[in-house]
Design a protein with these regions (language model features):
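Mid-domain alpha/beta scaffold segments of enzyme catalytic cores
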Residues: 1-271
């Protein structure tokens, strides 16, 4: 699995398209993705400015790029009374298909807990109002994260995906019971940090699994192909998909077909 393989069309549901790491090589990154068979992707937003920028320009770069609009918990301190209106404008475009990346992150605390809760709650309200999926982030805040979602959705399923799931079977079960889809990144390839995720992998229903790189972050361990830097790229998604297929005993072609169909079902991205 050391080299990128050209495979049946893959859909990367998590790319940080306007990361500074891609600033001088955006088109090259997109070209390599296409060469590797990654023909579709979701470019995820972290604040209002990035949401607007993605909304205005990302689909021009590549025919099958969809976007999100939202405020990451790290940027929750930037949330104000105008934020929801700005996100609402982006979401009027059919290419803007989810609210996020939003949630709670009590690990690095770039925004206070109260700021994060306020921004998260308002974005949930908007998602419920518009009937669009949530693109969810959670780190070191599981219990409160689940509590906030349950309080606002009640007994209804939560329409959305847990971005970059890294946790254990018990937490996986909670998310699945809420109706959520599960996004798996190259974290699963890490021998030490990915142990819980690998243990949980076989318990993710086939119709709830999504695959993503979270590029340029989380370059999969064990990859020894053409890239010599630490940067991750969407063209490495075939490596991640093949790793997941081997871990779960699935046929690679079927896994790719299933995860792509799951993505279309959740985000309504089928052209």
């Amino acid at each position: 699995m050391g080299n990128v393989k050209k495979v049946t069309t893959l859909f990367d549901v998590g790319v940080n398209l306007y990361s500074k790491q891609f600033k001088h090589d955006t088109q090259g990154m997109l070209d390599r993705a296409l060469e590797a068979g990654v023909e579709s992707m979701i470019a995820i937003a972290s604040d209002v400015d990035e949401s607007v920028k993605l909304h205005q320009s990302a689909p021009i770069l590549m025919p099958k790029v969809w976007t999100t609009a939202g405020i990451h918990p790290h940027q929750a301190s930037t949330f104000d009374t105008t934020s929801i209106d700005a996100l609402r404008v982006c979401l009027k475009d059919s290419r803007c298909i989810a609210i996020g990346e939003c949630g709670l992150d009590y690990n690095r605390m770039f925004s206070s807990e109260s700021e994060q809760r306020v921004a998260f709650s308002h974005q949930i309200e908007l998602a419920i109002e518009l009937g669009v999926p949530l693109y969810l982030h959670q780190r070191d805040a599981h219990d409160e994260f689940v509590s906030v979602l349950r309080a606002q959705f009640g007994h209804k399923d939560v329409l959305g995906v847990i971005h970059c799931f890294t946790e254990n079977r018990a937490r996986l079960r909670e998310y699945l019971d809420m109706g959520l889809y599960i996004g798996v990144t190259g974290w699963v390839c890490d021998e030490r940090r990915g142990r819980d995720l690998r243990d949980a992998l076989s318990y993710i229903p086939k119709d709830r699994l999504l695959v993503e790189t979270d590029a340029p972050y989380l370059k999969p361990r064990g990859y020894t192909g053409i890239f010599k830097t630490k940067r991750n790229e969407p063209c490495l998604l075939p490596f991640i998909a093949e790793f997941i297929a081997k871990q779960t005993g699935a046929e690679l072609a079927h896994l790719i077909e299933q995860t792509t169909e799951n993505t279309h079902r959740l985000f309504k991205t089928k052209l």
